[in-house]
């Protein structure tokens, strides 16, 4: 059993155990659509060259979301084992490719089941906002009045209006609302942490 040491380290450990030159990396809540599966088979038959990315389509509380900044959400998930590694912190992980690695785009969607209920979304926001606040504190960031008051409002308008989240119906509204709440919480918690450090 490998000791948990964060998402990036865990994925790099799994990559090191892979027996083949190319890796397809999927999370537990993801699956390949039939179209994407066919695209991958075609690419394999033609011979792998570089890395491969594809659109990720997210299911939010039972509805597929195509707006609000959540789609196409391109992810690079097929890559040469020797030319890629995961980097990042305990909040996010990012795939880093060697310079010059070509990224090809495949047709079809990577299906992603993210939040199964509004309470699930709220619970994760509470948890991740704490991690974000601690990270911002370590980076020396501040949480002034303008940031705490206006950033959540801008986040809502950005997702619901400018990125057309309203076209996803109630799902789009709740995504924009909880995205704004996530911003409000992380700045509120950062403000509290800063106050505690001054005390």
Language model features by range: what are they?
Residues 28:
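Walker B catalytic motif
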Residues 9-16, 21, 33-197:
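Catalytic-site signature of metal-activated, phosphate-bearing donor transferases
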Residues 2-7:
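Short, acidic/turn-prone active-site loops that include or flank metal/cofactor-
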């Amino acid at each position: 059993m490998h000791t948990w040491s964060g998402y990036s380290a865990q994925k790099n450990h799994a990559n090191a155990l892979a027996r083949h030159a190319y890796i397809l990396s999927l999370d537990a809540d993801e699956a390949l659509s039939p179209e994407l599966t066919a695209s991958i088979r075609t690419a394999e038959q033609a011979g792998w060259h570089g890395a491969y990315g594809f659109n990720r389509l997210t299911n939010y509380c039972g509805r597929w979301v195509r707006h609000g900044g959540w789609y196409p959400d391109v992810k690079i998930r097929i890559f040469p084992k020797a030319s890629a590694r995961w980097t990042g912190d305990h909040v996010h992980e990012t795939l880093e490719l060697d310079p010059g690695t070509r990224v090809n785009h495949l047709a079809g969607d990577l299906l992603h089941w993210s939040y199964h209920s509004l309470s699930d979304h709220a619970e994760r926001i509470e948890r991740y906002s704490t991690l974000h606040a601690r990270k911002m504190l370590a980076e020396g960031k501040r949480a002034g009045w303008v940031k705490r008051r206006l950033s959540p409002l801008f986040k809502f308008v950005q997702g619901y209006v400018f990125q057309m989240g309203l076209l996803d119906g109630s799902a789009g509204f709740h995504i924009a609302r909880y995205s704004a709440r996530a911003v409000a919480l992380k700045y509120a918690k950062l403000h509290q942490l800063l106050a505690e450090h001054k005390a």
